[in-house]
């Protein structure tokens, strides 16, 4: 019986992978060799990376290629929408590289992709994991106005390490502002652990995220992609993750994922449903 289940899972994985390949689009799930890909795809969740695979920024923890990005594919919105339908997904995460070369940082393209996905798949829950759009409030609002259900933007690390870890065009304060601009939508952010932060700094960052209304928090271990990226300063054990999870819930987060291999999209649908229940119970957005 177990072997039959494994065969069915593998056949389904190959089918979904083939659809992505035929559409000529990218999923973070495959590109980043995500360890959670089987679980996520099996539960109807996938993360699409739009606007190419070359980033205009050079964050020191990230393995994504840096340089001059490709031209936008104006067929991408419909390609992603069709892939969502053919893959039978019910929760979609749309993310991208930074596109500082574009006047609006890619906000219009994000909006077009979300609208296309929603139009073709009206029951699908859509989460966007966005760049900071240079801290531009109107661009953040433009993306949210396209009909997203979850707005995610990662602060990535604690305040003191931000200049070391992230590109100079990013800042801790700017990321908090971006999250504060998102209104009437579930909000999510992530913190990478093991870059040299203290427990007190992690808790301070949690508090800062709650102060700008973040509902869902993801805590995960930083894993060095290659020798070109920053070294891992510490590997957290499960007891430490449990303690951080406990602290996060005490601060008022609706849902917390605290696991070494967690990614922003891990258990995304479950987190969204919990956050929405919290919103309704507390009459928020009314």
From Swiss-Prot:
Binding site for [4Fe-4S] cluster 1: 29, 34, 40, 265
Reaction(s) catalysed (UniProt annotation): [[Fe-S] cluster scaffold protein carrying a second [4Fe-4S](2+) cluster] + N(6)-octanoyl-L-lysyl-[protein] + 2 oxidized [2Fe-2S]-[ferredoxin] + 2 S-adenosyl-L-methionine + 4 H(+) = [[Fe-S] cluster scaffold protein] + N(6)-[(R)-dihydrolipoyl]-L-lysyl-[protein] + 4 Fe(3+) + 2 hydrogen sulfide + 2 5'-deoxyadenosine + 2 L-methionine + 2 reduced [2Fe-2S]-[ferredoxin]
Cofactor: [4Fe-4S] cluster
EC number annotated for this UniProt entry: 2.8.1.8
GO molecular function, one term: 4 iron, 4 sulfur cluster binding
Pathway recorded for this protein: Protein modification; protein lipoylation via endogenous pathway; protein N(6)-(lipoyl)lysine from octanoyl-[acyl-carrier-protein]: step 2/2
Subcellular location: Cytoplasm
Pfam families xrefs: Radical_SAM
Binding sites annotated in the UniProt record for [4Fe-4S] cluster 2: 55, 59, 62
Annotated family: Belongs to the radical SAM superfamily. Lipoyl synthase family.
Protein name: Lipoyl synthase
Organism of this sequence: Sulfolobus acidocaldarius (strain ATCC 33909 / DSM 639 / JCM 8929 / NBRC 15157 / NCIMB 11770)
């Amino acid at each position: 019986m177990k072997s039959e289940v494994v065969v069915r899972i593998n056949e389904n994985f190959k089918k979904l992978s083939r659809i992505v390949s035929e559409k000529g689009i990218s999923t973070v799930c495959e590109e980043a060799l995500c360890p959670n890909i089987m679980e996520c795809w099996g539960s109807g969740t996938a993360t699409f990376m739009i606007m190419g695979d070359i980033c205009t920024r050079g964050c020191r923890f990230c393995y994504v290629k840096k340089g001059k990005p490709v031209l936008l594919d104006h067929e991408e919105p419909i390609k992603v929408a069709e892939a969502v339908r053919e893959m039978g997904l019910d929760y979609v995460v749309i993310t991208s590289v930074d596109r500082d070369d574009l006047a609006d940082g890619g906000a219009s393209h994000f909006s077009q992709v979300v609208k296309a996905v929603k139009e073709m798949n009206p029951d699908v829950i859509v989460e966007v994991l966005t760049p900071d759009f240079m801290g531009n409030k109107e661009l953040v609002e433009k993306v949210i106005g396209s009909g997203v259900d979850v707005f995610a933007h990662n602060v990535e690390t604690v305040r003191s390490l931000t200049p070391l870890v992230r590109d100079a065009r990013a800042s801790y304060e700017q990321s908090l502002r971006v999250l504060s601009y998102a209104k009437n939508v579930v909000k999510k952010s992530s913190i990478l652990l093991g870059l040299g932060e203290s427990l007190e700094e992690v808790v301070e960052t949690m508090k800062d995220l709650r102060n700008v209304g973040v509902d869902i928090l993801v805590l995960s271990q930083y894993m060095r992609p290659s020798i070109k990226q920053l070294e891992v300063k510490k590997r957290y054990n499960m007891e430490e993750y449990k303690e951080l999870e406990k602290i996060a819930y005490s601060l008022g987060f609706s849902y917390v994922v605290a696991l070494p291999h967690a990614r922003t999209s891990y258990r995304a649908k479950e987190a969204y449903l919990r956050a929405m229940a919290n919103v309704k119970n507390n009459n928020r957005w009314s």
